[in-house]
A protein has these predicted regions:
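Catalytic glycan-binding domains that act on GlcNAc-containing polysaccharides
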Residues: 23, 42-239
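N-terminal secretory targeting signals
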Residues: 1-55
Length: 239
């Protein structure tokens, strides 16, 4: 993948029953380098069961944490706050957790390189409740402007906005979505690239939760308690 030199775009995560987190879209950060390492998912079972996509092991966390020179407990703290107690990145096989944001879609649909819609887009089968609601909104938007819809959605266990696809080391938002839909291991890799390329990694290394949460979750992080929640989560996993 080609290198990226760009400013961190705004990251917004709407409050959800799954992630239990929200943030504002007014944070910025500086790109300090480009991370290209990608862990492939060649060892997952061939069957299309949920276990094919979920189930990060301690070894998975350890491999990425070692490369980033950051504590495993620090990474897990972010997962807990962004993905909730279940710490999962998928609602069903091949169906990642998403949060569609209409304001972000309206902003980014005009910026999409490919503004075509996918008239054949379908809502994944078997979803209910909040998952069905979010995927229905995303699918309806995809029928109008597929790339814009993907850019205006927050993806996976780390709730990374699709508009940040380049900062995750992807050439296109389509590639970003494909990787997000492959496994939690790929979601972890995308997160690692994201925090490296946006300059957030030093804050996570130092466990400077205020600085990290301000960049990751926006200026209202303190009012929403992101920094204290991450600190408490870190303490939990550090035991």
């Amino acid at each position: 993948m080609k290198g990226v030199a760009a400013l961190l775009m705004m990251l917004l995560v709407t409050a959800t029953a799954v992630a239990g987190a929200s943030c504002d879209n007014d944070s910025t950060g500086n790109v300090t380098g480009h991370r290209e390492m990608r862990v492939r998912v060649d060892t997952v079972p061939a069957t299309d069961s949920l276990s094919r996509y979920t189930g990060l092991t301690d070894a998975d966390f350890e491999a990425v944490a070692k490369e980033l020179d950051v504590e495993i407990a620090a990474i897990k703290a972010v997962v807990l706050i962004e993905a909730g107690k279940q710490m999962k990145g998928f609602w069903a096989p091949g169906v990642p957790v998403v949060n569609f944001d209409r304001s972000m879609y309206n902003s980014h649909r005009h910026k999409a390189v490919n503004k075509k819609g996918d008239k054949n887009a379908k809502v994944p089968a078997g979803l209910t409740g909040y998952a069905l609601k979010e995927w229905t909104q995303l699918t309806n938007a995809r029928r109008q402007n597929e790339d814009g819809a993907n850019m205006g959605t927050f993806w996976g266990m780390f709730q990374i906005g699709g508009f940040n696809y380049k900062l995750c080391g992807c050439e296109t938002v389509g590639e970003f979505v494909k990787l997000m839909s492959e496994s939690e291991l790929e979601q972890l890799e995308l997160f690692a690239a994201f925090i490296t390329n946006t300059g957030m990694l030093p804050d996570l290394k130092a466990k400077n939760w205020s600085a990290f949460a301000r960049k990751y979750n926006g200026a209202s992080y303190a009012r929403r308690g992101y920094h204290t929640r991450m600190a408490n989560a870190y303490a939990k996993f550090k035991k």
